[in-house]
């Protein structure tokens, strides 16, 4: 499994940037996507995929320790849907 450091190394290799500059670029991309999602904006990267915020409805659940029914509040969660080019590349 690749991690953030692996991603930074690949970006540095592909762009001939230093690892420090690549780390700054990767961090900037992640924080920018996060900022758009925090504002409720969808981020569409043609060919790669879409990042968006989805609403999870309130629902009933069970406490696994007691078995008592509990109410789980509605929430917002980040979601990613892969684009066609990414799906095709993985096949």
Curated annotation (Swiss-Prot):
The keyword DNA-binding applies. GO terms for biological process: chromosome condensation. GO terms for cellular component: cytosol. PROSITE patterns: HISTONE_LIKE. GO terms for molecular function: DNA binding; structural constituent of chromatin. It comes from the Bacteria. Keywords: DNA condensation, DNA-binding, Virulence. The keyword Translocase does not apply. PANTHER family: DNA-BINDING PROTEIN HU, DNA-BINDING PROTEIN HU-BETA. Histone-like DNA-binding protein which is capable of wrapping DNA to stabilize it, and thus to prevent its denaturation under extreme environmental conditions. Also seems to act as a fortuitous virulence factor in delayed sequelae by binding to heparan sulfate-proteoglycans in the extracellular matrix of target organs and acting as a nidus for in situ immune complex formation. Belongs to the bacterial histone-like protein family. This is DNA-binding protein HU. The lineage of its organism: Bacteria, Bacillati, Bacillota, Bacilli, Lactobacillales.
């Amino acid at each position: 499994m690749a991690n953030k450091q692996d991603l930074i190394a690949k970006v540095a290799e592909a762009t001939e940037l230093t690892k420090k500059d690549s780390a700054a670029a990767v961090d900037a991309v992640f924080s920018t996507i996060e900022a758009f999602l925090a504002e409720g904006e969808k981020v569409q990267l043609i060919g790669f995929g879409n990042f968006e915020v989805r609403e999870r409805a309130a629902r009933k659940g069970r406490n696994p320790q007691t078995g008592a029914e509990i109410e789980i509040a509605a929430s917002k969660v980040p979601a990613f849907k892969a684009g066609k080019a990414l799906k095709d590349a993985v096949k």
